[in-house]
């Protein structure tokens, strides 16, 4: 079964593949779609077991990356694309680079977890306890607020929450929490900007440093004052950062090298 795909912009322009975070769909890139569709060809899929690709199951990093490689090969201008990923999508982007780096021009990966998260073993049983109540409007709102999803996207967020099955959420969380650095990264020279928000846990900064150190063409920066979901919560800064990276211009002043602590 094919993935749901939305395309924007001129087909002959350089392509950008946007890979969304866990639990939401391609709609979460709406601020970037509006900012970049005028001069780039945008590929915005719903990843397996997400949004309108809910029936493409089960989710796994290797399958998702293989599907993204096929998508670039078939739909991207010239058979290659820039890749932009957030959270789960950035993990898929890492695997895509490892297995099909020749298809990727420049990459921007934000909020990429590579390390064990304390208490991860409790998340799956907690999810099953939460599942019967996940569609209660009050809980949907709390979850939306905790993830930094703006009010303007309440309807889309609520719809994705209601559509998601417990099995899908379990598959996605397992893949996310088990993700570690894949083999093959050390040979990569793709220009890659690894990002982390200042307000993310310190483990995410360590992951960013680790990922950047593993790739010859990578560099790690921290976005001052930003949360994990900053492409949606602070799109103006994210869009300036992305455009600067794609056009090989200096990064905004709000971006600083990831500190050692």
Indicate where each model-derived feature is located.
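Acidic catalytic loop of the alpha/beta-hydrolase fold
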Residues: 199-203
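Conserved alpha/beta-hydrolase catalytic His-Asp/Glu region
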Residues: 118-120, 134-187
């Amino acid at each position: 079964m094919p993935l749901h795909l939305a395309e924007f912009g001129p087909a002959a322009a350089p392509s950008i593949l946007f890979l969304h975070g866990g639990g939401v769909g391609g709609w979460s890139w709406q601020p970037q779609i509006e900012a970049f569709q005028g001069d780039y060809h945008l590929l915005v899929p719903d990843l397996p077991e997400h949004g309108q690709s809910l029936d493409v199951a089960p989710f796994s990093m290797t399958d998702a990356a293989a599907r993204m490689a096929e998508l670039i090969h078939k739909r991207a201008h010239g058979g290659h694309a820039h890749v932009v990923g957030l959270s789960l999508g950035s993990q898929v982007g890492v695997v895509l680079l490892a297995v099909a780096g020749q298809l990727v021009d420049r990459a921007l990966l934000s909020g990429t977890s590579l390390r064990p998260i304390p208490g991860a073993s409790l998340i799956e049983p907690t999810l099953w306890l939460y599942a019967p109540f996940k569609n209660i409007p009050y809980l949907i709102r709390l979850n939306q607020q905790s993830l930094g999803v703006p009010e303007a996207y309440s309807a889309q967020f609520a719809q994705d929450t209601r559509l998601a099955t417990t099995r899908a959420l379990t598959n996605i969380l397992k893949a996310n929490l088990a993700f570690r650095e894949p083999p093959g990264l050390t040979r990569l020279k793709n220009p890659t900007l690894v990002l982390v928000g200042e307000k993310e846990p310190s483990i995410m900064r360590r992951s960013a440093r680790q990922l950047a150190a593993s790739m010859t063409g990578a560099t790690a920066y921290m976005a001052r004052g930003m949360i994990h979901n900053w492409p949606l919560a602070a799109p103006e800064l994210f869009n300036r950062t992305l455009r600067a990276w794609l056009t090989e211009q200096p990064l905004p002043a709000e971006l600083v090298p990831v500190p050692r602590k």
